[in-house]
Amino acid sequence: LVAVTVSVDDDGTAQSCHISGDFFIESVSDAESHALLHDLERALISDDSLRSVLDAHPSCQIIGTDEIAIKTAYSRAVSSNLPPLAGAPAQRVGVGSPDAPNIPASINTQTKQPDKSSEYRERWNALKPQLTVIHDHPRTPDEQMAIDETWAREVAAGTRQPTIRLWEWAGPAVVIGRFQSAQDEVNLDIAKQLGFDVVRRCTGGGAMFIEPGNTITYSLYAPLDFVQGVSIEESYRLCDWWLVEALRELGLDVRFAGLNDIASQYGKIGGAAQRRFPVGSGGAVLHHVTMAYDIDAAKMSRVLNTSREKMSDKAVK
């Protein structure tokens, strides 16, 4: 989903706006990503072409939304039926991308994908001799976010071996995506009351509801060569191939769903996020996954401002 918050003057004229959501942006730097969003926001206010803005940032790629969805969210916010009042809160409207609808996993996963198992196995076999697997000790949510980006940048710089890190959480958390709005995604007062830390990760995607012992989280820090020649969409399947195969060997009916989800016949059971860290001729890909197996859905619904659309494919009860 992409959301646009619009601030209007006394006459109802849009003065500024802010784009947020669970989309991803791949770029050479944080500055490039922020510049793209800033230029898109300016184009919305001035009614300029969003496609021209995207074309002017060839080093950036948006995944999970597009200019049509962004423009639609902005138009809905501006033309909201709520009368603009001086000093009233900015209006925020979210909309899903028409190119990436949130289809329930039971439907979406029926789409046949080419079988790339042999290619994925070859890539993993090539990576395996260099790969270190670490079952990490419990860390606070802030520490988890910091170490994830630090280790990814170290692999990118060649100072750390490719690594799989299995997380342990020291406390409950809500982890929001790189471009999400905390106040829009989380009931911050309730989260604080219940002892949840709200932290932002360095990758895009949606909010994760974490309670220690109820989730499995892992990160893969791999050289960028591991995903060389593979589209961003396909790289999610490559990075999670070993996990899906392992779950199937345990007798579980799991498959890939949408861009970045892992699903069973009951719905979504896990979600992934990914980001590339290009550095000269090297670089790294950070890919992390959280699978929830015992969610307290009632508590989650209190802590998160989760839309009905986003909940439509979640295997919770």
Q: Where are the regions that the model predicts?
A:
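Active-site- and interface-proximal helix/loop "cap" or "latch" segments in soluble metabolic
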Residues: 3-85
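Catalytic cores of processing enzymes, dominated by hydrolases/peptidases
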Residues: 267-317
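Contiguous, small/hydrophobic- and glycine-enriched helical/loop subdomains that border
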Residues: 215-262
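Structured beta-strand/loop patches that form or line metal/cofactor-binding pockets in enzymes
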Residues: 1-13, 262, 269-272, 276-279
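A generic structural motif
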Residues: 21-26, 222-228, 297
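Active-site loop/lid in soluble adenylation, ligation, and acyl-transfer enzymes
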Residues: 1, 65, 75-94, 98-189, ...
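Residues forming anionic-ligand binding surfaces in small-molecule and nucleic-acid pockets
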Residues: 206-226, 312-317
